[in-house]
């Protein structure tokens, strides 16, 4: 198969928001200042901010793309998926660890940057941080969560964050995690990027770790 159109879209609607609110998954402590509500890795994070949107990518066989003089933005160099089924909303972290390990193995090298799943939930952020520290020991790549700026667009977010990662490769920068006023203790052992930083990264991992233990990590590299 030469071309695959891949992506997702999500309409932010009260009917879906209310379900996540009933589960206690959404932030409520910053209702008076909603721009500060999505704060992955801050000690005062209290849930995610639901959003909407869409993202579409064209995955194309390299020689096919060259023949039609396509503008090749990046290469999909690694991928892995796991399903741990530990809990509906509280991840174990083990599935995330295996997922990142598998993606790195398929790529064959370490990465310069991770766009984390980082939704701003107390339990989810902690599990992902612990998995990253266990995987990379004392040599963590730069990490940040673009959800701190965009919110969590559910079914669209995996495609969107792959696009954001490609933009960072192309435009030579690392996006920040914003709203970190008091960084959580667990994040102090990783290279957490809190400002837009000029950096000519060559590879980026994008993590999507959903409710129910469905996990995917993909690695895009500069072309």
Mark where each language-model region is.
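Short, active-site-adjacent cap segments at secondary-structure transitions
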Residues: 11-14, 121-123, 150-151
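Conserved phosphate-binding/catalytic loops in two-lobed NTP-binding clefts
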Residues: 138-151
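Stable alpha-helical structural segments in soluble proteins, enriched in small hydrophobic residues
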Residues: 99-107, 131, 135, 161, ...
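Local beta-strand N-terminus motif with an aromatic residue
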Residues: 1, 110-111, 140, 201
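Conserved beta-strand-centric core segments of catalytic alpha/beta enzyme folds
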Residues: 1-64, 157-223
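Condensing-enzyme catalytic core mediating Claisen C-C bond formation in acyl metabolism
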Residues: 34-113
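Glycine-centered flexible beta-alpha turn that most often forms the glycine-rich phosphate-binding loop
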Residues: 117
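Short glycine/threonine-rich loop-to-helix capping motif typified by GTGT followed
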Residues: 85-96, 120-136, 153-160, 193
